[in-house]
A protein has these predicted regions:
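Phosphate-group recognition and catalysis centered on beta-loop-alpha active-site segments
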Residues: 1-227
Length: 227
């Protein structure tokens, strides 16, 4: 597995500025939409964070929630709707739900951080990345380690990836309780930790934890900072 700095995905300037679902805080923009992503880039974001879900006809769309109630006021699940039905929906600020392919095509220089939400979303997400030849500008992640590993195994070439929750917790236990024993094996197939500052009693934002991760060629990205 190539180390982090061998991937063009990590060549952006520091500090990394990830736009969580695009410029989602803007009063006139919807989250996870092409205008929201473009606005984030216009405001100096170095990376775009988004989520993939699968439609009923197995197309990867950029959408966070399982259903459309919060952002569109519709009591329906993304997985139950066809792409045509998804495209007919307008979000609360008039935005349209994009496919992953549309986003990769519309923003050809943008670097995407993709959280694969469900098992059915794996195949269409990989298909969109492969068709766009976007391996060098996409990082694949998931809260589910089996989903993350399945996605990586389905790709035709290596791609940047971040650790799942279980990976991060394992690394923290190694660092905090085992004096780093086993840390290298835990992070051998990840290039970044994407974590909250705190989770329950655990404080991830310590100099020692960040330093240990960086010594193992693992970047640390905190979410969310200013939402």
């Amino acid at each position: 597995m190539p180390i982090a700095h061998e991937f063009p995905y990590f060549e952006a300037p520091r500090p990394r500025l990830f736009a969580h679902r695009g410029l989602a805080q803007h009063a006139n923009l919807d989250e996870n939409t092409l205008p929201g992503f473009q606005a984030a880039l216009d405001h100096a974001a170095t990376h775009l964070e988004s989520d993939t879900q699968a439609t009923a006809d197995d197309v990867a769309v950029l959408f966070h929630d399982e259903d459309l109630r919060r952002v569109a006021g519709i009591d329906a699940r993304v997985r139950e709707l066809s792409l045509a039905e998804i495209k007919a929906i307008r979000l609360k600020n008039g935005g349209e739900i994009p496919t992953l392919s549309e986003a990769l095509r519309a923003l050809p220089q943008a670097k995407f951080n993709l959280d694969i939400k469900t098992k059915p979303a794996i195949s269409p997400t990989i298909e969109a990345i492969e068709q766009a030849h976007a391996h060098e500008r996409v990082l694949v992640s998931s809260f589910s380690n089996p989903i993350r590993k399945s996605a990586l195994a389905s790709l035709s070439r290596p791609i940047a990836t971040s650790g799942s929750l279980t990976t991060v917790l394992g690394a923290w236990i190694s660092h905090r309780l085992l004096f780093g024993a086993g840390f290298s094996s835990i992070v051998r197939d990840v290039h970044a930790f994407q974590i909250p500052v705190r989770r329950g009693p655990i404080n991830f934002a310590t100099k020692s934890f960040i330093t240990r991760a960086q010594k193992h060629q693992t970047e640390v990205h905190f979410w969310t900072i200013n939402e």
